[in-house]
Amino acid sequence: GVEHAILHLLYSRFFMQALSHQNNLFNIKEPFSGLFTQGMVCHETYKDENNNWVSPDELITKDGKKILRDSGMNVKIGPSESMSKSKKNTIDPEKIIKDYGADSVRLFILSDSPPEKDVQWSDEGINSSYKFLQKLWVLNQKIIQEIEANHPPSQNNNLDKITNKFIKDITQNIENFSYNKIIANLHETYTGLNKIILNKIEKEKLVENYKKILIVISPIIPHFSNECLEMINIKENLLWPKVEEKFLFEENIKFIIQFNGKTRKIIVSKKNTTESLLLNKIKEDNKLNEYLNNKNIQKKIFIPNKLINIITN
């Protein structure tokens, strides 16, 4: 926990101070530029009728209640606290890994909360991560099929956009220790890939982009990533991919159209559309133009690439 980590920092600073005073050639007084303390993994606590701590492995659920498996004795559920051997609110990592796999455990621990916050362990959470991994595996099978189909080249850049946005987001979130956001990025990219994977993407483009995605997710779910890389015969040149900024430029964006502060429609137009061009689009739209009929425009509030609010009387 935090207190434990701070003690290590205190000892380290003491040693560095002592060394710097005893050795004129040694002039490093601060051992670390910063300290990031991680949260704890927490679990519900349980006591039997004799007020003894009991382990989750000793319990079963019957009629919606927790009871001891061997004796049938009722169990009192206590607050969720950091896992400790004394309170027996631990889980057996070997059993969890055997049942769900190491990648599911990694996914769950990272996805539940920011790393500086406590993680609440739950069977539902680990099961949800396991099911998401199964979805990723099904998607992998679809991608393999599309690679084997060997489609001809096309000018569609949707896959490049998804891949480069993913690389940029993951890289930033790793550098910022925002590991829970990485899992959100993974869910978003999974949804995007599922939508475009049947668009007959050429083999070379599909392999190259999928390779980059697998490299980027390797710190999170390494076993899954390595297995998929082998399936597309990628065994070398596994450097962290660089972002190609040209694919992050959005040609069309959404503009919010408001009248007197109320949103009436969201329209799509080219990036950097001017106020006058946006006003022309509004007048060309029959429904939006109704808000202008027989009314005077008193004021226009225009925020580039975001919204226009037309004040009328």
Tell me what each language-model feature is.
Residues G1, T45-A102, E116-N127, K246-L248, ...:
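Conserved phosphate-binding loops in nucleotide/dinucleotide-binding enzymes
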Residues V2-H8:
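Acyl activation and transfer enzymes in specialized metabolism, enriched
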Residues L7, K88-N89, E208-N209:
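Short, glycine/acidic-rich beta->alpha junctions
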Residues L9, R13-N23:
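Alpha-helical support elements that line or immediately flank enzyme active sites
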Residues L10, N24-P31, K95-V268, F302-P304:
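Helix-rich, typically C-terminal accessory recognition domains appended to large enzymatic cores
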Residues F36-T37, S269:
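A secondary-structure boundary/capping signal
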Residues T37-K47, S218:
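Short, conserved secondary-structure transition motifs
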Residues I147, F255-N313:
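NTP/phosphate- and nucleic-acid-binding module
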